[in-house]
Structures are given as C-alpha cells and as structure tokens.
Amino acid sequence: MNDTESKKVAEVPEPTGLSRRGFLGTSAVTGAVLAGATAIGGAVFTRETWAAAAKDAQSKTHVGPGELDEYYGFWSGGHQGEVRIMGIPSMRELLRIPVFNVDSATGWGLTNESKRIMGDSAHFQNGDCHHPHLSMTDGKYDGKYLFINDKANSRVARIRLDIMKCDKMLTVPNVQAVHGLRLQKIPHTKYVFANAEFVIPHPNDGSTFDLQDKNSYTLFNAIDAEKMEMAFQVIVDGNLDNTDADYTGKYAASTCYNSEKAYDLGGMMRNERDWVVVFNIQRIEAAIKAGKFITLDG
C-alpha cells in the first residue's frame, strides 16, 4: 500500500451512531454497575428472609403426584438430534421424540417405517437440532405440528402433535447448514421459513471454492408446511443467521453476517455492520406465478 492509499484509508469517516466495539465497551461498564447494584440490593436480605422467599418460589413450581403441569415446553436436543418435552412449571422431562438420531428404544432410524419418513437422509445417524416452533392459525398456536431444523445435514422435520412423533422430513437442496427456522403465523402456517447459513458455490461440485464469484451465495428457503416440499428459494448475499415472520402474513426477515464472503473469523468481522434481509411473501409468489425464476440443479 503506498502513502496515497494509506491517506485515503485514514480519511474514511467513522459511521455515525454507536459502533459494535463501542457498544461492547459500554455493555461491560453497564454490567459492572448492575452487578454492584445487585450486591447492594442483596445485602438487605437476611438468611431467613431469603430462605422463606426461596421456599415460596419452590412451592409454586411443585407439581404433585396425579397433578398436571400448566404448560408443556418443547426443547431442541442439539447434537442429540431429538426434541424433548418438559412440563412447566415442574420442569420434569416427560418425553423424548427421536427425529434426526437413531433411537434403539423405539427403533427410530432402524425400522423400515422410520427410514421411509427420513427419506434420502436415512443413512445419516446424527443431527443438530435447532429452533423448534409450533404451527399457528391466526397468530396463535393451533397444536397441529412442530417443525425443527437440522443444521448438521440441512434438513427440516415435522412432528405431529396429536401423536408426538415425526411424520415428515425434508432435505433442503442447494444449501449448506439450515439454521434459523420460523413459521408463517397469519392466516395460518402455510410456509416454514428456513435460513441456509453458509455461502457456497453453485453448483457445489468441488470445482471451485471462490466465495467472491457471482455464483456463490446462500438461500432463504420456504417449505410447504402440509406437503413438506420446497415451495421456493431466494438468492441472498452473506451468511443468514436467524429469521422470523410478521403477524400480518406479508413479511419474513433474516439477519445476515459475513457480507464480506470471507473464510475466517477475522474476515467475517471486518465490516462494522452487515444487514437484515426482508422478504415480501406476496411479491415472491407473484414473481413465481409470472415465471420469473430459475431452476437450480440441487
């Protein structure tokens, strides 16, 4: 780099507002202040007062024999590849639902029936469960389905809540690592929205690893919730992280990082800011209906 180029770099104005590094520094100071306040506040509790408060809180979470929890919570099992159902407020584990794993107790992943459900991904013996979400009608849980994604092998599975078992599974094509899954809320869960996290070359056949190439990108994915088939995919720059849909049925939005299309952490953190990508669902549907799309050989 010559002196002229160095001068140009030095003269680039800082973006307005609080920078990422400034925010982290401010957060550290704020955290120290809050910690101090908590310590001061904690000093007013005697041991007896604290014990009484803890006992009262415990009594509100106790669910006795023959009693039912008020709510059921659905947790992802992470690298276990399963979904776990827990009672709330008791926090007792009630059931484990095998999804992306092999389960000897039930035969999941071993029986012909379960292999038919798993389809072309039945040979995988592992999964990385993320983001379980319940289907909705008019913005409220309808108790019909639960959907969950597998980051390890780019899959999305559906669990029927009337039987608490996985009944459909889809391998998302043209992508690497499905991460970030949400559902259309209004008027009902027509689509399952799933981010593909990593930028990859297309076709991803090993002929190139150039992420700066125009044919290197990631995809925002919409899955037909009833058929469990791909509805559409949208080409996006940068790695997609998390996603969500609004309460009007019009928009979905995804957070993005690595707008630099870098390979390492330092490169991915180079830009001060990345972006949020907003998708207009009706316009996407209209474009597909008008034939304004391409087909990828995934």
Region roles according to the model:
Residues G36-A43:
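Hydrophobic alpha-helical membrane-insertion segments, chiefly the h-region
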Residues G17-L18, S27-G36, E48-G298:
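Predominantly soluble domains enriched in secretory-pathway, periplasmic, or organellar proteins
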Residues M1-G22, R47:
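N-terminal secretory signal peptides
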